[in-house]
A protein has these predicted regions:
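Short helix-perturbing small/polar motifs within transmembrane alpha-helices
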Residues: 1-58, 64-165, 169-208
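Cytosolic signal-transmission helices at domain junctions
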Residues: 211-220
C-alpha cells in the first residue's frame, strides 16, 4: 500500500478502537438471551457472502443486524454483533494471504459505520420506520465511502469509479434488506423477539437471489 493508504488505514483503525473502547466501557444489555440469539444469527450471516464482479471485496447480509440493533438493541450490543459478523465474513473460506489485514480494516470500518448510524438515528424523536430509514441511509453511505476510500488508495483507481460499482450492487439489496428487516421488526414488536427466526429464511433467500444475479453477469 502507498503511504497515503497506510495513513488512511491507520486513522480508520484508530477511530474504531476509540469508538469500541468507549462502547464496551458502557456495556449494557436489556435481554442477554436476545443478544446471544442475534449474535448467533449474525455469525451465520457472515458466512453467507459473495464476491461481486469487478469489485475487490465481498458482500454479506450483516447489515440486517445493524438495522435490528438500531431498533431493538443498545449501541455496544450492535457494535459487537456487527463486528463479529464482519470478522466471520472477512476470514470465512478466504485464502487471501492479506485476509488478516482485511479483517482489521473491515471490522474497524463497520464499527465506525454502526456507531454513526446508531447515533444519528437515535438523536431525533423519529417514528420507528423513519428511524430505520435514516439508519440504513447513514450506514450505506458511510460504509461504501470508507471501503471505496481504501480501495482507491491501495489500487490507485478513481474514487468515483470504485464507489459507483459498490453503489450499484449494494443499493438494490440494501433496499430489499431494509424492507424485510422492517417487516420482521414490526412482527417482533407485536409478538415478541422470539419470532426472530423469521430472519433465517429471509437471509438465505436474499443470499440466493444475489448469487443468481451474479451468475447472470457476463464473464462471471
Amino acid at each position: 500500500m502507498s503511504r497515503t493508504a497506510v495513513v488512511y488505514f491507520g486513522c480508520v483503525v484508530a477511530l474504531a478502537c476509540f469508538v469500541l473502547a468507549r462502547a464496551i466501557s458502557h456495556w449494557e444489555t436489556e435481554d442477554p438471551a436476545r443478544f446471544f440469539v442475534y449474535l448467533a444469527f449474525a455469525f451465520l450471516a457472515g458466512t453467507l457472502k459473495v464476491r461481486l464482479p469487478g469489485i475487490t471485496g465481498t458482500f454479506s447480509l450483516n447489515f440486517l443486524f445493524v438495522l435490528i440493533g438500531v431498533a431493538n438493541l443498545t449501541s455496544p450490543e450492535t457494535l459487537v454483533i456487527a463486528g463479529t459478523s464482519m470478522a466471520v465474513q472477512s476470514v470465512w473460506r478466504s485464502s487471501n494471504p492479506a485476509r488478516w489485514i482485511h479483517l482489521l480494516f473491515n471490522v474497524s470500518a463497520i464499527t465506525i459505520c454502526v456507531q454513526l448510524a446508531f447515533t444519528v438515528a437515535r438523536s431525533f424523536p423519529l417514528p420507528f420506520l423513519l428511524q430505520l430509514a435514516v439508519a440504513s441511509g447513514v450506514y450505506f453511505l458511510t460504509n461504501t465511502i470508507l471501503v471505496s476510500g481504501i480501495l482507491t488508495l491501495a489500487e490507485d483507481k478513481s474514487f468515483l469509479a470504485v464507489w459507483s460499482r459498490w453503489f450499484r450492487w449494494f443499493l438494490a439489496y440494501y433496499g430489499i434488506g431494509v424492507t424485510t428487516t422492517a417487516l420482521i421488526l414490526i412482527v417482533n414488536r407485536q409478538t415478541g423477539w422470539g419470532y426472530a427466526l423469521l430472519i433465517l429464511p429471509i437471509m438465505y433467500l436474499e443470499y440466493m437471489c444475489l448469487c443468481y444475479d451474479i451468475k447472470e453477469v457476463p464473464g462471471t
